[in-house]
Curated annotation (Swiss-Prot):
Species the sequence originates in: Exiguobacterium sibiricum (strain DSM 17290 / CCUG 55495 / CIP 109462 / JCM 13490 / 255-15)
Domain of life (superkingdom): Bacteria
Keyword Isomerase among record annotations: no
InterPro entries in the cross-refs: PurM-like_C_dom, PurM-like_C_sf, PurM-like_N, PurM-like_N_sf, PurM_cligase
Lineage of origin: Bacteria, Bacillati, Bacillota, Bacilli, Bacillales
Top EC class, one word: ligase
Protein name from the UniProt record: Phosphoribosylformylglycinamidine cyclo-ligase
Cross-referenced Pfam families: AIRS (PF00586), AIRS_C (PF02769)
Reaction(s) this enzyme catalyzes, per UniProt: 2-formamido-N(1)-(5-O-phospho-beta-D-ribosyl)acetamidine + ATP = 5-amino-1-(5-phospho-beta-D-ribosyl)imidazole + ADP + phosphate + H(+)
Entry similarity comment: Belongs to the AIR synthase family.
UniProt-annotated location(s): Cytoplasm
EC number assigned by the record: 6.3.3.1
The protein's annotated pathway: Purine metabolism; IMP biosynthesis via de novo pathway; 5-amino-1-(5-phospho-D-ribosyl)imidazole from N(2)-formyl-N(1)-(5-phospho-D-ribosyl)glycinamide: step 2/2
């Protein structure tokens, strides 16, 4: 059976070797609440050990989009798993949920154990950074479905929060202050546009740009920041009204998701430093300024909304985590998002 299966393009041997290689990486992320080992039909997590009186589970799923194309082009697969974890855990921490466990799904045309190990090592690193465990996953070898050397990756995160401590944004009011935490770069959104700009520029991912201090490829592949530890610290103040993870849709689409009806937001781009990568993308691609804020994070990957009198306390707590906080905007009584110097 295995010989016939292998002749059809599926290698059970490669699959077994891949699992064996990833075990040491998965072990790095283990939490004490995990009740099953790698390979169980279902992964089990003992929620009772969290000692939550009214636990609410919060879940999120995502992938990394066409950023994968850069990983393929450069044969760099060590950090793409961090991106996958980040996209999920940064979403669920928005509502105050501590990430507990993560499952990944990797689909590819041909199983190459060494490559799969590199991908999963990145996933495990993302889990370590966010304090959750890589509790399970699936690696699917599907011949004929993907081009040689290509794959897709997606993930699913589950977190928990005490019901009374859910962050819902329902008490946000005009006059509240919006704090911003820096991004590491483009993160994992907008890469279809990024790839188009690079292709039309005549440059290669291997080319170095002085303004980047690195190659174009390395700058663009910089993994998405995981904000879990910083957010958990800020939540200790019990002063957070709402939070925003800036992903696809940039400022214009993501900020309104957490604002009550009748509220909007105004941002002043002069209040935080612009990353060189966004300056280059805007200039090289001749991208309108409004579109930049509608596609990219523009240097701010995460936002927190607080009362004016709580800015100092929240900023001080984040500073203890070596986090630089920018006061980037305010909540307004005019619905929608307005960016000074962009929206007139």
């Amino acid at each position: 059976m295995s010989k016939q299966y292998e002749a059809a393009g599926v290698s059970l041997t490669a699959g077994y070797e891949s699992v064996s290689r990833m075990k040491k990486h998965v072990a790095r992320s283990m939490r004490k609440e995990v009740m099953t080992g790698l390979g169980s039909f279902g992964a089990m997590f003992d929620l009772s050990q969290l000692n939550l009186k009214e636990p609410v589970l919060v879940s999120g799923t995502d992938g990394v989009g066409t950023k994968l194309k850069l990983a393929f082009a450069l044969d760099q697969h060590d950090t793409i798993g961090i991106d996958c974890v980040a996209m999920c855990v940064n979403d669920i921490i928005v509502q105050g949920a501590e990430p507990l466990y993560f499952l990944d799904y990797i689909a590819l045309g041909k199983a190459i154990p060494a490559k799969i190990e590199r991908i999963v090592a990145g996933v495990a690193e993302g889990c370590v950074q966010s304090g959750c465990t890589l509790i399970g996953g699936e690696t699917a070898e599907m011949p004929g479905m993907y081009a040689d050397g290509e794959y897709d990756i997606a993930g699913f995160a589950v977190g928990a929060v005490e019901k009374q401590k859910l962050i819902t944004g329902e008490h946000v009011q005009p006059g509240d202050v919006i704090l911003g935490l820096a991004s590491s770069g483009v993160h994992s959104n907008g890469f279809s546009l990024v790839r188009k700009i690079v292709a039309e520029s005549g440059l290669r991912y291997e080319d170095e740009l002085m303004m980047f201090g690195s190659t174009i490829g390395n700058t663009l592949l910089m993994p998405t920041r995981i904000y879990v530890e910083a957010v958990k610290a800020a939540l200790e103040t019990e002063k957070i009204q709402a939070m925003v993870h800036i992903t696809g849709g940039g400022f214009y689409e993501n900020v309104p998701r957490v604002l009550p009806e009748g509220c909007g937001a105004t941002f002043d781009p002069k209040k935080w430093p612009t990353l060189p990568v966004f300056d280059w993308l805007e200039q090289a691609g001749n991208v309108p300024r409004h579109d930049m804020y509608n596609v990219f994070n523009m240097g701010i990957g995460y936002m927190m909304i607080v009362k004016p009198e709580d800015v100092a306390a929240v900023s001080a707590r984040l500073a203890r985590e070596n986090e630089t906080v920018y006061t980037i905007g305010t909540v307004t009584s005019e619905p929608g998002v307005r960016i000074l110097g962009v929206d007139q």
